Amino acid sequence: MVTTHNLGFPRIGAQRELKFGLERYWKGESSRDALKALGAELRARHWNAQRDLDLAPIGDFSFYDQVLDMSFTLGNLPKRVQGFHGDVLDNYFRVARGRSAQVVDEHGACCGGVSAGEMTKWFDTNYHYIVPEFHADTNFSLDPSCLLQQLAEARALGVAGKPVILGPVTYLWLGKEKDDSDRLALLPKLLPVYGALLDTLTAQGVEWVQIDEPILVTELDAEWRQALRTAYAALETRRIKLLLATYFGTLGDNLTLAASLPVDGLHVDAINARDEVDALVRELPADRVLSVGAINGRNIWKTDLNATLDWLEPLAKQLGDRLWIAPSCSLLHVPVDLASEEKLDAEIRSWLAFALQKLDELKVLATALNQGRDKVADALAANAAAIDSRRRSPRVNNPAVKAALARIDAQLGNRASPYTQRAPKQSARLNLPAFPTTTIGSFPQTADIRHARSQFKAGALDEAGYRAAMQAEIERSVREQESLGLDVLVHGEAERNDMVEYFGEQLDGYAFSQFGWVQSYGSRCVKPPILFGDISRPKAMTVEWITYAQSLTNKPMKGMLTGPVTILNWSFVRDDQPRSVSCYQLALAIRDEVLDLEKAGVRVIQIDEAALREGLPLRRAQWGEYLKWAVEAFRITANGVQDDTQIHTHMCYSEFNDIIASIADMDADVITIETSRSDMELLDAFDSFRYPNEIGPGVYDIHSPNIPTQDHIVGLMKKAAERIPAERLWVNPDCGLKTRQWAEVIPALTNMVAAAKTLRNQVQ
């Protein structure tokens, strides 16, 4: 019999209950006990939804991040949060965001907050994790209380499950040394703690543990490969079965290593690594389980169940009970329930599967494999009809878009002149001081803004009323910026619910869910639009709002657009053509918007490519192809403008050292980047690469409520000036200010502007 299991379930709740519960707690509007009760309620609901599985995941729920959870389980807390009184949950939030609940920190020893842990992308996804911190003297100590609590809850519900933990080698790989030490040297100290954790679970009667080592789908040098051998040789002696889980890609040259590790089962991503399954069957010892991720855990399209059975059936016959099936990865990366989508176009809806529907697909596959296809004939027929409907739909294919794509030539992405000739023209037109100040784009999405938007969408507020409300918010943003003394202004994006969804709503080829939320980090959720067909722009999308904002001030007003690569990487993308083709379609559509903004007199246009790096394949050997079309798509979007129009781009959560040449090749006049959490370490890339254009290294972390001091900002910018000529430096926050409150934004920007004025006097 084939065994079914799941690697992880979305933790936020179908209606984002966790998000709202966290935010209530942080604001002091609810108690710690209420938050913990909400967590227990969500876990129970999610386990009940997975009752049909042979093994449900236990320990996949987190109040913020599963990597941070592992740091606490291993006793690896940064020294700056040690010694505070109160519940462990409050220290947990201090690491995550610099503060815990408002009421806790106001009466505790850290009312000024602490530095939040560094946050970066989880492999090539749009989820973010808190980076573990290591020192030469780091010690580990086991605290399994959270995992044991969840195990007890699951058992009380009668749930058959397996605890899920992050593997020791991936845990070290994901972290960062805070001194000159080598984090891999900590493995001998770490392994006994993992061994003790497995012993604890054994004592609880646990049979299987899922231990995640996704680094096996990356390029590993000899040291890291040996670390995996060492780790699992040490853990082999434990009296518990280990399912080693990999996901997000192919094993490649790590296949033999993965198959040889002394574990009891191996999970592989059969969406990306289907071609490796036969080799794994040959290489795995005859007593090992092979778990295949046959359902795409990262996208929302229905699985072609009949085609999947065509290749699973011979495998089941060959492996028998040794075959397990599951989604390719944790379902954290997809929304919870398609049944909530009552307003979604019925035809498009018929093509989709969210987390609960993916579990239904898994059940159909298992029934067909265990009892024959006849047992699920109706379900298979309905699935085949949906797959065929999508394949044949004229809504997916637009001949005019394909014709425009065919007309792209090598000149379309080139500026008329090089940066050295453009810069003086832009300087003359903009007349900016040294160390010019700006923000990244968005200002706080207040309750009034959200209320007006919801009223408008519900039909309770007419278009004129909505426009007036948004114009009032734009005017507020402009007046605040003028009062602060910022040099290049933004309109604040009051009218935008999301930097990707806003554009997708106005592009043909996109559809939108009501409740298709996925977690980005902590309480931050995003609702990726659904790119289902060929993309085109029926009309201008931003010109009216930007020109209104410009009419309110004599200072330069930035046009704000999201770039094609980011729109692509932050969407659920059609899987019936190469991603590059969809990206070029987006580039042509956004290019039209850029040119319309320029015609309207907009002097500075920002095209955000926050997600450029996260689209990189996990294996460096495949980077070249991706960067070629990604950079070309940006250039097509941006480079049709005149020399005196200044193009900005923004990138966040990016390590730039290894792609700095490609970033330079984008040829944006100004790039703004996230650097503050890394204390300007990201600028190390510029030690060996002379970046030719202007740059704004982010000087304060907008993801934390902490207010940066003027001296701190001056210090960061002086570090930047050691690497980049002062005349090419801008001063700006790390990212947009949408998620902050005005009460936090005003003092932070006040200090930022004051720091810029100090720098103009101190730095020549």
Swiss-Prot record:
GO terms for molecular function: 5-methyltetrahydropteroyltriglutamate-homocysteine S-methyltransferase activity; zinc ion binding. InterPro entries: Cbl-indep_Met_Synth_N, Cobalamin-indep_Met_synthase, Met_Synth_C/arc, UROD/MetE-like_sf. NCBIfam families: met_syn_B12ind (TIGR01371), PRK05222.1 (NF003556). Binds 1 zinc ion per subunit. L-homocysteine binds at residues 440-442, 493, 608. Pathway: Amino-acid biosynthesis; L-methionine biosynthesis via de novo pathway; L-methionine from L-homocysteine (MetE route): step 1/1. The active site is at 703 (proton donor). It catalyses: 5-methyltetrahydropteroyltri-L-glutamate + L-homocysteine = tetrahydropteroyltri-L-glutamate + L-methionine. Signal peptide: none annotated. Pfam families: Meth_synt_1, Meth_synt_2. Belongs to the vitamin-B12 independent methionine synthase family. It comes from Burkholderia ambifaria (strain ATCC BAA-244 / DSM 16087 / CCUG 44356 / LMG 19182 / AMMD) (Burkholderia cepacia (strain AMMD)). This is 5-methyltetrahydropteroyltriglutamate--homocysteine methyltransferase. The gene is metE. Its cofactor is Zn(2+). Keywords: Amino-acid biosynthesis, Metal-binding, Methionine biosynthesis, Methyltransferase, Repeat, Transferase, Zinc. L-methionine binds at residues 440-442, 493, 608. Zn(2+) binds at residues 650, 652, 674, 735.
